[in-house]
UniProtKB/Swiss-Prot annotation:
Species the sequence originates in: Corynebacterium aurimucosum (strain ATCC 700975 / DSM 44827 / CIP 107346 / CN-1) (Corynebacterium nigricans)
EC number: 2.4.1.250
Recorded catalytic activity of this chain's protein: 1D-myo-inositol 3-phosphate + UDP-N-acetyl-alpha-D-glucosamine = 1D-myo-inositol 2-acetamido-2-deoxy-alpha-D-glucopyranoside 3-phosphate + UDP + H(+)
Record GO biological process: liposaccharide metabolic process; mycothiol biosynthetic process
Protein name (database record): D-inositol 3-phosphate glycosyltransferase
Residues where 1D-myo-inositol 3-phosphate binds: 9, 20-25, 78, 110, 134, 154
A GO term, aspect molecular function: acetylglucosaminyltransferase activity
Record: residues binding UDP-N-acetyl-alpha-D-glucosamine: 15-16, 23, 231, 236, 294, 316, 324
Cited function: Catalyzes the transfer of a N-acetyl-glucosamine moiety to 1D-myo-inositol 3-phosphate to produce 1D-myo-inositol 2-acetamido-2-deoxy-glucopyranoside 3-phosphate in the mycothiol biosynthesis pathway.
UniProt binding sites for Mg(2+): 303-304, 306, 330
UniProt similarity note: Belongs to the glycosyltransferase group 1 family. MshA subfamily.
Pfam (any one): Glyco_trans_4_4
């Protein structure tokens, strides 16, 4: 079995936490790796952003990343990438033709890639499996007042994919409900595949490992630590955590607390200075420490150094950071949105907050910061909870989905395109 995965707007080899790289990158790379270890041949097609990348990167046996030149290497935002859909699709088609590669299934990730996959499906007469990761209609429902709404053009493209993909893969049952409610999707075409965490990499630390992690990060040993890991964009809610920190320090100015925010700017209107300035304005610049994005091997130290990991997002299809933190033995305080109520067992492995107010977040953080036995017990339960989610299990499910897709009778391409949105 040979799979053409498409991740146009971001390479799975890019550093998560900066630019457009995030949970989707982690998902694509880890599922592809596990599929390759099951014997599935996987080529991941992405848009080249540097000439030094090379056309073909051999990641491991049976897994390659193919960098397709489509437009300039630099200077295009994600919002401008639709102008390069034709060039990118043509690049994939020419690669497969020149190297005489035949694929059995296309698996596209995100709506931009889905548009490419939709056309290639008709050209190659093979099934299309699509994973949206985020949906315009859902993001618009949950966006903040000063967030730019997703465009109607994107929503139309997503509707086309819902109507025309052979199988839709989602992370949670909540995503299934979202597709049905906002896009009138058929439940028969939707399959839930829960993401996982690398439980070999993300493991609970001993007291000695926690001390070492804190020394590496320059954090005092007897200080409580709350960590945030993710892109610095409004949708991820780093400002919520900073405001909650100010509320905590106002309640108890002598509180020994450090808040570590690890991530980089994302989006045209995003800048780390926004959050640095906010911390300064609220008087917590000495409490909040900003770190640049870290590779997974270094994120382990941040999770192990933290007493709590905060995930104050306005929406998450699943919440990989929450799962990685729990695998590391750290309880999570998360917003009760999207897939986070599935990723976090409320009251057992962390707490869910049903608003984004600084007061409510300070209340939740305070509960765990001031209750060592409860927090430690939650951390222990978090490890067991995370063990239920694995990339190996997700890949096994995907392999079965691909096999099912290959058995679908593919209608005539002209008839199929005639029913486009």
């Amino acid at each position: 079995m040979r799979i053409a995965m498409i991740s146009m707007h971001t390479s799975p080899l890019e550093q998560p936490g900066s630019g457009d790289a995030g949970g989707m990158n982690v998902y694509v790379l880890n599922t592809a790796r596990q599929l390759a270890r099951l014997g599935v041949e996987v080529d991941i097609f992405t848009r080249a952003t540097r000439p030094s990348q090379g056309e073909v990167v051999d990641v491991e046996e049976r897994l390659r990343v193919i960098n397709i030149v489509a437009g300039p290497y630099e200077g295009l935002s994600k919002e401008e990438l639709p102008t390069q859909l034709a060039a990118f699709t043509g690049g994939i088609f020419n690669f497969a033709r020149c190297f005489e590669v035949d694929y059995d299934v296309i698996h596209s990730h995100y709506w931009l890639s889905g548009q490419v996959g939709w056309l290639l499906r008709d050209l190659w007469d093979i099934p299309l499996v699509h994973t949206a990761h985020t949906l315009a209609a859902v993001k618009n429902v949950h966006r903040t007042l000063d967030d730019t709404p997703e465009t109607e053009a994107r929503r139309i493209c997503e509707q086309q994919l819902v109507d025309n993909a052979d199988i839709l893969v989602v992370n949670t049952a909540q995503e299934t409900r979202d597709l049905i409610e906002h896009y009138d999707a058929s439940p028969d075409n939707i399959v839930v595949v829960s993401p996982g965490a690398d439980t070999d990499l993300y493991t609970p630390g001993t007291d000695r490992m926690t001390e070492r992690a804190r020394r590496q990060l320059g954090i005092p040993l007897h200080t409580k630590v709350v960590a945030f890991v993710g892109r610095l964009q409004k949708f991820k809610g780093p400002d919520v955590l900073i405001r909650a920190t100010a509320e905590l320090m106002e309640r108890d100015p002598d509180r020994r607390l450090r808040v570590v925010i690890c991530g980089g700017a994302s989006g045209a209107n995003s800048s780390p200075d926004t959050y640095h300035n906010l911390a300064r304005e609220l008087g917590v610049e000495r409490v909040v420490r900003f770190l640049s994005p870290r590779p997974p091997q270094e994120l382990v130290a941040i999770y192990q150094a933290a007493d709590i990991v905060a995930v104050p997002s306005y929406n998450e299809s699943f919440g990989l950071v929450a799962m990685e933190a729990q695998a590391s033995g750290t309880p999570v305080v998360a917003a009760a949105v999207g897939g986070l109520p599935i990723a976090v067992a409320d009251g057992d492995t962390g707490l869910l907050v049903h608003s984004h107010s600084a007061q409510d977040w300070a209340d939740a953080l305070e509960q765990l910061l001031d209750d060592d036995p409860r927090r430690i017990s939650m951390g222990e339960a978090a490890v067991d909870h995370a063990q239920q989610f694995s990339w190996a299990a997700a890949a096994t499910q995907l392999e079965n989905i691909y096999a099912d897709a290959m058995s679908i009778e593919i209608p005539d391409c002209h008839a199929r395109r005639a029913i486009g949105y």
